[in-house]
Amino acid sequence: EWAKDGVTGDLFIVQARPETIHSKAQSNKMTIYKIDEKLADSLKKQGRVLATGQAVGKRIGTGKVRLYRTYSEVLEGKRELRKLLESGMSMEEISSELSVFEEGDVLVTEMTTPDWEPLMKQASLIITRKGGRTSHAAIIAREFGIPAIVGCSDAMDLPNFATVTGSCAEGDTGYVYSDKVPFEIEEVSFDEDIELTTKIKLNVGFPTKSLIDSKLPVDGVGLARIEFILSSELGIHPLAFVHHDELKQFVESGELPAGLKPYQESFIESDINDVRSLVESLESRAWAYEDKRDLFIDKLREGVGLICAAFYPRPVLVRLSDFKSNEYRELLGGSIFEPVEENPMIAWRGASRYLDEKFKPAFEMEIAAMKSVKYDFGLDNLQLMVPFCRTPEEGQMVKDLLEENDIGPSSGTDLFVMVELPSNAIEADRFMDMMALSGGSIGSNDLVQTVYAVSRDDLEGYQNPVDARSPAVKSMIRDIVRKFKAKNLEIGICGQAPSDFPDEFPPFLIDCGITSISVTPDTAIAVRATVAAAEKAANL
């Protein structure tokens, strides 16, 4: 425990005790969930299967169904609960149906966005009607080791408040059974002293969870996502921090300041009370900051800094912000600063957003946070990655922006590009040279949708579904690895493919010669074991 002197700023350690929880945790164990095959067959014959979908992970979860069609229903439920508590009722007096969501409940909805993440962390099982194995629900479920069944067409027909069991331990199909179903949990140990040629890294996005994940036998972080910090820790659109003074001026005078003119149409359609609410919310959170942008920078650098510190000195590859416009619109103030796009997945995102004069001030706050992590915190294991970079010229301009702030390649910060577009593969040599790259990381999620021209959020709706195992994607991955290795640069993969297919995909990657594989924490041990076997077979 520590205390800081409010006058002098001195920091005092006032108490220290041996840590007894995480130090005893064993990182060389793999948990396997099993449901008896005869029992599963019997349940199917009895008609106990309420719904099916794509299984995410290999676990089993059971709990009470809490069905919400939209996140606004969650917010309304919270408001009603608050009224009951303010009237003098205690939580013990309030029925569980009015509690909104309790630890261990089963979350059922159409499709999740970052807004849902606080509820998702408490769930024993997540079921969505839409989405595939690379959807938001699947990615977050994997990171927290929560079973999920996505693309479940009958999800919204599940009986609310009923007890169900969701099994992802029976192959690619996830089954939702009625009532509680018995299952077994088995722990398997492995030898973590085996040295691998291929580095195994983690995909992380939740700073506090990285303290636990860092105990796993991995070589660092191959993908650190900052979107959770933006949505849950801040929850306000970054441009609202930039334009705080002008927003306040608009609320007070009713006249639109020059700095907000690019968003004139949004203000015409907005209720001034919504803008007032945005300003009040921002000021209540940033009351201690004269310049409201400093709150954004502080929260971002603290979150990224925690991840870097947890894994230090192992490298942490931080992907610069990659929210799409529809995701930014979910943040407070998002409807003012974001357009409504037909297909946000392939529109205003990644590098093109950073360079846009409208968004550039927000990206500059991001740069300031990263610079502080490296220089103020001294965490020199920070690496940066540019996502959704369409052309080498675009990549060079982003690199130049980083260089101007002493956080680019010339100042010793490793720069990577997310290899997720056909152009990244076709012009790989130019990307490497013009961006002075230290390496690349294959984003198989977006690579599938850009190679096959399909929306990754709706893959389950296609007659002939494709994924990272499909021939064109595998051919492109092999070509990407060859080009990066020819220049002696690191080339890894951070998409969901190795996590979704831990027995099948890593051997293919090793055959390609990939240098690192980054996976979700729940599959790290299984992938490590698969890689060890594949390397032994290949005499690596």
Please report, for each region that a protein language model flagged, where it lies by residue.
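A short glycine-rich, hydrophobically flanked beta-strand micro-motif that places a catalytic Asp/Glu
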Residues: 1-6, 492-496
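Phosphate-binding site of ATP-dependent enzymes
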Residues: 5-11, 420
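Acidic, glycine-rich flexible loop/linker segments
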Residues: 7, 14, 18-25, 30, ...
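Amphipathic alpha-helical
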Residues: 18-60, 391-415
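Non-catalytic terminal/interface segments that mediate subunit docking, oligomerization
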Residues: 29-110, 332-349, 353, 358-371, ...
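Conserved alpha/beta-domain cores
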Residues: 188-540
